């Protein structure tokens, strides 16, 4: 289980600064299943919808629920695109003079409600974020629309292939897709539900959200990374 509780006192700041040192001492130990993790960001997130927020708090509090197409390898320093690895994507390639970014997706991923993850979800998410004319969802607040203004079109030729067609080459697109603000949303879930709820593909499922108090997650038994997560 994971519980995220906002903390305000100065003592909380000190505790948070000390936290990154703990895993270093534990790296030689064999991971064990079970247990509870309590984390304490310095503020409460306004919602559990990263695409509609700009605070670090929303990433901290919503990230257990979600996955990206790609992400930065947590075992390496985030120094270049060479540290970006697949997550919901199995692999990717640049084509047509780096104007097309093609992703091949994992086939073993389910949303927390049991529905399969497909390319339609990726297209839905980024058509919505870039405010495409034919987008099936609209964000009330869209702080990162400019990130994706170079996208000409997003195509889903089959359930496990996604093509980002660009107006011109954009090497920075991959790092933006690896950002904590770039999770994939389910196309079948109304966007309004993400105000206080969360249906993702991540290692933890939302159990309870008390805005301003805590967000509690439990282990996702169907998580696509076998044997993970370790926490209950």
Tell me what each language-model feature is.
Residues 1-33, 91, 153:
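Short, low-complexity disordered leader/linker segments with a strong preference
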Residues 32, 104, 123, 142-186:
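Surface-exposed binding/hinge segments that line
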Residues 33-44, 90, 100-102, 122-125, ...:
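Short, well-ordered beta-strand elements
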Residues 40-96, 127, 197-201:
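N-terminal lobe/hinge region of extracytoplasmic solute-binding protein
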Residues 42-45, 53, 74-75, 97-99, ...:
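Solvent-exposed coil/turn segments that connect beta secondary-structure elements
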Residues 64, 87, 104, 117, ...:
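Extracytoplasmic/secreted proteins, especially bacterial periplasmic and envelope-associated proteins
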Residues 71-79, 170-232:
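Gly/Pro-rich hinge or "lid" segments in bacterial periplasmic/extracellular proteins
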Residues 90-135, 163:
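Aromatic- and charge-enriched surface segment that lines or borders ligand/interaction sites
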């Amino acid at each position: 289980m994971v519980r995220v509780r906002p903390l305000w006192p100065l003592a909380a700041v000190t505790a948070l600064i000390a936290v990154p040192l703990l895993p270093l001492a534990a790296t030689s130990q064999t991971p064990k299943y079970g247990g509870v993790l309590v984390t304490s960001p310095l503020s409460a997130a306004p919602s559990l919808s990263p695409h509609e927020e700009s605070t670090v708090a929303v990433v901290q509090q919503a990230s257990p629920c979600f996955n990206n197409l790609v992400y930065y390898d947590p075992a390496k320093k985030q120094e270049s695109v060479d540290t970006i690895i697949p997550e919901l994507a199995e692999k990717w390639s640049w084509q047509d003079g780096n104007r097309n970014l093609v992703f091949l997706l994992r086939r073993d991923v389910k949303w927390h409600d049991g529905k399969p993850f497909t390319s339609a979800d990726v297209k839905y998410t980024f058509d919505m974020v870039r405010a495409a004319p034919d987008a099936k969802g609209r964000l009330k607040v869209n702080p990162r629309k400019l990130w994706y203004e170079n996208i000409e079109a997003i195509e889903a030729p089959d359930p496990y292939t996604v093509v980002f067609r660009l107006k011109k080459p954009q090497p920075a697109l991959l790092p933006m897709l690896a950002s904590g603000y770039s999770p994939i949303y389910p196309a079948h879930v109304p966007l309004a539900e993400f105000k206080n709820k969360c249906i993702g593909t991540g290692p933890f499922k939302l159990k309870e959200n008390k805005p301003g108090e805590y967000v509690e997650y439990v282990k996702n038994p169907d998580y696509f990374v076998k044997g993970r997560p370790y926490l209950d």
